[in-house]
Amino acid sequence: GMVKNYWAGVKNLQNQLFSIVGSALFAAGLWLVKRYFLSYSWRGMLLTTGVLLNCIDMPFVFLTVFDVVRNQYFYLGETVLVEVPAAANFVVSTFVIVEMAEEGNEGLVYGLLTTTANLGAPVARAIGNQLFGLFRPSLSDSANYIADTPAFRRTVASSFALSYAFSFASLGFLYLLPGQKEEAQRRKREWAHRPAYALAIVL
């Protein structure tokens, strides 16, 4: 966004090169999970990767916002470092979806849950835009980034802090997930099947 373009000064070529490196690390992360972490607790892995993703991001963001380090290579380093935990997060989320599907409707369940999950990002972005629109000075005005006043830096930092707070708060719902495939199968056998539950989750 604005921080990346105006304060970190990220150029398109460097951005694309780091994206390629990030994709390679994402693939490496998928292999690591397959090789070493398949039997680990899903809740534990999602908690660990969720915390790591935020904790890795924070220093790069705040050091750039407060003009401690403003360098495109420094800022892009974060996009590379998060790829391994992001891969683990992705794999575990996929495992949960696969295990929750009943035999014969795996494709339907996978499609429904992945579509619902994919809707989360644009909906969250829309809500975030409305919420961040309340901040003053405006976070969407490029002139504020060019002026780069201490007051505006604090405003930008506050918006990021709010984002991190929501991200950490979402981890509080992890207890709803099964711990591993055995628990997922047990829940499917023993828990009551109610359409209202599915509707509530989708909404």
Briefly describe each language-model feature range.
Residues 1-25, 46, 73-74, 155:
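Loop-to-transmembrane helix entry
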Residues 12-13, 101-116, 193-194:
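Loop-to-transmembrane helix entry/capping segments in MFS-fold secondary transporters
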Residues 15-40, 49-61, 121-124:
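Transmembrane alpha-helices of Major Facilitator/SLC transporters
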Residues 17-18, 49, 78, 94, ...:
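Hydrophobic alpha-helical segments of secondary membrane carriers
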Residues 43-44, 130-166, 184-201:
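A membrane-interface helix-boundary motif in multi-pass transporters
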Residues 44-92:
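C-terminal transmembrane helical hairpin of 12-TM major facilitator-type secondary transporters
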Residues 58-62, 119-138:
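A gly/Pro-rich, aromatic-decorated transmembrane alpha-helix motif that marks the paired
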Residues 88-102, 106-108:
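Intracellular juxtamembrane helix-capping segments at the cytosolic ends
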